[in-house]
Each structure stands twice: as structure tokens, then as C-alpha cells.
């Protein structure tokens, strides 16, 4: 994963990323607050279920793609055996 490094200090990098996240997400929170105020308990439970279900699916996808990328890496043992044969 490519990570942008803003400064040499990891804590400052974390704060910059946190600030960028807050700036990006704040309009969504502000615009959706009216809808949140009118939400019933049933709606909240349904939303929690959807969020949890989405998280589980993303978790599974992450590990599937991690396994696929590991399979694409060349096997170091085979390259070592080839070097010994030569």
C-alpha cells in the first residue's frame, strides 16, 4: 500500500491525516444530521446490521486479495534451488 509521508515525524503525519479525514467527512455529518434526528430504533438497528455486514465482507475481501498477492510473489526457495544448480 502506498502511503504519503508528509513529514519525518509520524505523530504529525497522523494528525495531518486525521485533519484531512475530518475535513472530508464533516459535510456528510452536517448534511445527514436532520435524517439522523428522525431515525427510529428500528432504523438504527438496520443501519448497524448493514454496517457490520459490509465490514465483514470487506474483511473477507481484504484477506482474499492478500492471499492472491502472496500467490503472485515468486517462490524464493525455487529461485535458491535454481541458483544452486548453476
UniProtKB/Swiss-Prot annotation:
The keyword ATP-binding does not apply. This is Protein TrbE. It is a multi-pass membrane protein. The chain crosses the membrane at residues 11-31, 45-65. Coiled coil: none annotated. It holds the Pfam family TrbE. GO terms for cellular component: plasma membrane. It comes from the Bacteria. Keywords: Cell inner membrane, Cell membrane, Membrane, Plasmid, Transmembrane, Transmembrane helix. NCBIfam families: PRK13718.1. Not determined yet. Not required for conjugation transfer in rich, aerobic growth media. It is found in: Cell inner membrane.
Amino acid at each position: 500500500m502506498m502511503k504519503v509521508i508528509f513529514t519525518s515525524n509520524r505523530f504529525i503525519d497522523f494528525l495531518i491525516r486525521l485533519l484531512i479525514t475530518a475535513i472530508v467527512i464533516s459535510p456528510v455529518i452536517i448534511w445527514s444530521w436532520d435524517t439522523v434526528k428522525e431515525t427510529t430504533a428500528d432504523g438504527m438497528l438496520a443501519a448497524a446490521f448493514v454496517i457490520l455486514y459490509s465490514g465483514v465482507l470487506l474483511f473477507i475481501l481484504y484477506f482474499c486479495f492478500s492471499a492472491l498477492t502472496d500467490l503472485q510473489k515468486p517462490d524464493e526457495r525455487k529461485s535458491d534451488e535454481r541458483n544452486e544448480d548453476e
